Swiss-Prot record:
GO terms assigned for molecular function: (3R)-hydroxyacyl-[acyl-carrier-protein] dehydratase activity
Pfam families (UniProt xref): FabA
Active site, renumbered: H47
Name of the molecule in the record: 3-hydroxyacyl-[acyl-carrier-protein] dehydratase FabZ
Keyword terms: Cytoplasm, Lipid A biosynthesis, Lipid biosynthesis, Lipid metabolism, Lyase
BP GO terms, sorted: fatty acid biosynthetic process; lipid A biosynthetic process
A single Gene Ontology CC term: membrane
NCBIfam families attached to this UniProt entry: fabZ (TIGR01750), PRK00006.1 (NF000582)
Enzyme's top EC category: lyase
Annotated compartments: Cytoplasm
Keyword Lipid biosynthesis among UniProt keywords: yes
Record-listed E.C. numbers: 4.2.1.59
Amino acid sequence: MSIHQVMRYLPHRYPFLLVDRVTDFKPGEYLEAIKNVSINEPYFQGHFPIRPVMPGVLIMEALAQATGLLAFKTEEARNENQDKQQLYLFVGIDEARFRRQVEPGDQLHLRVELLRVVRGIWRFKAEARVNGDLVASATLMCAGKEIES
């Protein structure tokens, strides 16, 4: 899924769109995506000027955006909510862990797996890797919200 297709599903735009491409997915199961981390990212001006590091909360946000994409693709495959405009909102995070810093030039590989959906709350296992090394992980939750045009 190209960036143009990603933008059809996610409402985020620069500088807050944190998924550059979806490399693989299976509706109802998993989604894999990448975020290319560039020195031109606006947050590097202040985090940290001497040694730029991607903020951990933005790594989690990138993973959360990937969960939204998987939720959209899953509902699309099930032919659910096709006639409604919907957003997936980030509603929870458990067991977040950060294992190493992400720096300019890194390519962040995102993988989210759907664990279950209970009463409209989608629960995912989420991992971010750089060069195969785990840099962050968490259990993330999102919920669909119908929006009016």
